[in-house]
Amino acid sequence: MPRNYENAAPTQFQRLPEYHRDEAWIRAFLHRAEIGHLGHARAGQPYVTPTNFWFDEENRQIIFHSNIAGRMRDNLEHNPQVCLEVSETGRFLPANTALEFSVQYRSVMVFGKVTLLKADEEQRRALYGLLRKYFPNLEPGVEYRPISDQELARTSV
């Protein structure tokens, strides 16, 4: 008989215990993962938006950015509850019967509430963290122009 998850916490583990990962594995996975899928909703309509992100481990925050205006920003202002799913595909597993074919994958789901960063220095720190994740060998002011006040005014972090 299927389980009833209606009253279960979203973080309640649902897989076999041998597939459970500890905090260190989860943190390392969030640091190396390239793309996350941000689940958000508005007026009962769910949306999933692929996004790059930075796991700010020191502050236990997931940092991402979007346009200053748009559907995602509007949705998040009305309903800040989100879920970020991050995954990577493993091996494809053939079988002798169709229903036994499978795929291995690793994933993490993070549940939380979006908070828009307001202070310019907070935004800069977050954006530079995001840039360091994807372009670790490039330095602001050397390989690219530092983030300007005008650019900060055009983005949401």
Regions found by a protein language model. Name each.
Residues 80-81, 85-88:
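Glycine- and acidic-residue-rich phosphate-binding/metal-coordinating active-site segment common to enzymes
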Residues 1-17, 91-157:
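Charged, gly/pro-rich active-site loop segments
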